[in-house]
Amino acid sequence: MSEPKPIQDTLDRRHSRESSISSASTTSLVFDRLAEESEKNHDASSRPHPSAARHAYTDDNSDAIKESDINDPETGPFLGASSETTPPRKGVDRKLKKVLLIVGGFFVAAWIVSLVVFLTNKSYKHGSQIDHDPAATNRKSGKRVTLDQVQSGFWRPTSHTFSWIPGPDGEDGLLLEQEARGKHFLVVEDVRSQGSADGEAHPDAAESRTLIKDPWFYWGDQQHSILQTWPSKNQKKVLVATQKQRNWRHSFTALYWVFDVESQSAEPLDPAHPEERVQLATWNAQSDAIVFTRSNNLFLRKLADDKVTPITTDGGPEYFYGIPDWVYEEEVFSGNSATWWSADGKHVAFLRTNETEVPEYPIQYFVSRPSGAEPEVGEENYPEVRQIKYPKVGSPNPVVDLLFYDVEKGDVFTVDIDGDFPEKDKLINFVMWADGNVLVKTTNRVSDVLQVNLIDIVARTGKTVQHVDVAKIDGGWFEISHVMYIPADPKNGRPHDGYVDTVIHNDGDHLAYFTPMDNPKPVYITEGPGWEVDGSASAVDLKNNLVYFRSTKESSIQRHIYSVHLNGTDMKPFTDTTHESYYDVSFSSGAGFGLLSYQGPKVPWQKVVSTPSNPKSYERIIEENKDLTQQAKKHELPVLEYGTIKVDDVELNYVERRPPHFDKNKKYPVLFQQYSGPGSQTVTKKFAVDFQSSDGGRRTTRSPRRATGRPSATSTPTAFAIWGWSYGGFATLKTLETDAGRTFRYGMAVAPVTDWRFYDSIYTERYMRTPDLNRNGYQQTAISNTTALGANERFLVMHGVADDNVHMQNTLTLLDELDLAGVENYDVHVFPDSDHSIYFHNANRIVYDKLSNWLINAFNGEWVKVNDAKPKIES
């Protein structure tokens, strides 16, 4: 926490899309449109009478857009966040907190059996549990939510993101603001400078400091627009990026410059090669050197002169230095960096990735040319093809090892660990400097055995300090967790260095303090049982020996913030636990302040608060979303019901969204939203309206069975439909296949996995092991029973042609199997040049228009006519 965090392209925008949440879903929109059709054929008197009293709207919903990932397919303006993790991850899903085992179609079968029992017993009939009106079973008349509103962001709460930055002398409570309204382009400001709750400026607030005045600079006669910035620790220089070009989800290339704050001028990072694109650049803590990757080789630039020193020379298409390849970027680091400076600036640790044996997969672009290169003469009418090194299950993984560079001696070296995993069976999951040591977490290929290694960088020796067989603990696998270093401070009760990590304890994820560094037996800071820590520690206050974290202590669908002493005593809530709430928090570099984000169930708000670590109390509301509150009062939003359903003796959460004017005496069509992916939790108390997944501790997330959602008040199987995106698309098709039309008649699958042998090795083998070890599991999970799919009324499949994550191969292989079996009860829509998020050329709007219209036609019986087409004979 001693170095400034990189800020995003747009920091602290007042109408940020970064941390936004949807409040309406495809389902409710479809029901509204179905209601419109119904009104044409029914007398107005048959409609339920609106509620007699109007109440201020406070929605109990949990369908949120992922923070910092608005374009993610699982979390667009209609979908719930697929998981709750720190840091964010994706799905086929990349927000990975917890996981469940994919074992055949058994979890789907178990869910369907439970669903049938659930419907038969009519256990869905219960009272409303809506936060803003506990007695309400319907809403008073108002405006209807429209598809255009949701897609335009009409229902998205305004939220702000802070990039906390330590002062040059360790000052706490400083923010890095980029493009803030009415200010210079890049400013360091005390969080208290804008006043407290009474509107008065805080007397202790430090003066603002401008780092960059304008969003552009000149070099020679060329003007360059600044897109991203990274200040040095002493705040005298700023590393800036211009002309960014996206690579994969997190990675990009750009032209990099060193901007001098005093002179407000810039120079190229490599003065001898100003036009060469750089993949990654990182400051040291001394603010006098930058290490960067270019053309997959690592270089060092010391600011004392213009000289650039090559650290590696054999980088290229097969070897990567200091940056991850596709699968490590996507599944391990969730970012574009594999470079780590030591705190004293004397050493650099970096990953070497050898992709020599990794097979390639072609990504085709039929409309655009993402490379920016002009086609060869005569090839103008051919698609651009990009070959991606993509390890599918069972195929060779990239071989990775950790290298070190001694800045003073100029040599590169490795440190061997006795008993380490063989190179082809090793994954490096985490690297952290701890004074003169380096902590490295590695696992075997299938991630069920963990080793924690400790390297003495001066002696150039290392040893294993922990060896954990996760499979023996609960039959699960290793979860990637992020460690916080706790330096020794004998005067403050810490005689040795240590670290805080997330470990499995009392059937859940809990925080443990390991000290000294090589001690395998920790002090458990949190213990449960019945609740767990969400992700890793949020912050550590070294002065007061306090650890802050977010947990499920009040409820698995709530999140509150707590503090606890490093010795595991004096745990206290930081947020108000007397009300159902879902909180997130971002702490300042010294943990003296926090940006507290209330995310539901009422309309979200944000405020800056002092923490128990700060002797001076401070509070300032920065966002109330008053406009959204008024909008909610004027519109008809769904009525929500929360509850649990038992699957294999495990209680799983569900949320049922009822139409605004729900009448228990009527029958309604039902749409199930599936995600169900490993690590997913989408049933929460966040402000939003959509079906969600479940999480009830380690047992439910390690279970091979998963239930998601449940029906509204109906027992008519012909009115059941199901849909999902990515893993949810797989779950949708597997449900249709297993059910064979007995419960569900319609399904919509977007970017689905249809055979896990087509997906990447690191993600899939973590849950299913390799095909050699689990051949039956892979066969059973593949969508292959075309006869069963044909027994459904109709289903829809959509996919992006340039999907680098869930390859188009999944959908095309399924279509071939359907053709061979003569199955025709389906529709297909493909999107040229769209990746997994399906956004290219208006594609995302088309996705949701298609889902909405297709579902309306399904519930109106139109697909019955299509499936049994009759020629129109003229008389």
Swiss-Prot record:
Glycan-modified residues: 354, 567, 785
Pfam families recorded: DPPIV_N, Peptidase_S9
Main location: membrane
Domain of life assignment: Eukaryota
Bias-annotated ranges (Basic residues): 699-708
Membrane topology (UniProt): Single-pass type II membrane protein
Keywords on record: Aminopeptidase, Glycoprotein, Hydrolase, Membrane, Protease, Serine protease, Signal-anchor, Transmembrane, Transmembrane helix, Vacuole
Record region (Disordered): 1-90, 689-715
Protein name: Probable dipeptidyl-aminopeptidase B
Provenance organism: Verticillium alfalfae (strain VaMs.102 / ATCC MYA-4576 / FGSC 10136) (Verticillium wilt of alfalfa)
Protein's gene: DAPB
